[in-house]
Amino acid sequence: MYIPQGNSLLSGTIRSNLLMARPDATEAELQEALQVASAGFVMDLPEGMDSPCGESGSGLSEGQCQRIAIARALLRPGGILILDEATSALDPETEMQLLHNLYERYHGQKTILFISHRDAVVQFADDVVRV
């Protein structure tokens, strides 16, 4: 699954955006994906996952949109995840938490490829290629 830098959310609810990845996902699977993606803030919104998000995620910050897009990608079946500057709008602390969560949950289970200008990713990498 490819996750680009830009916002890829569609108009609807956060839940509908997540379910695009896997329509049969359970509530627990949706919540786990949000937790791993450091998007637990969703559960604090007045309507939780049923909170609306406009086209391109309007109503949410760019960093929030990125984390929801990552959560959606985590719901897709498959063994490869490609994050292309997908944490660019996150503050360093949130980025580190997300990277830690991904490592703890998927290390050895999925191949995760980070394309990034940030050095935070390096400590979670098995291999680093600099171009």
Labelled PLM ranges:
Residues M1-G6, I14-N17, A33, S51-V131:
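ABC-family ATPase nucleotide-binding domain "signature/switch" substructure
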Residues N7-P52:
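Conserved "ABC signature" C-loop
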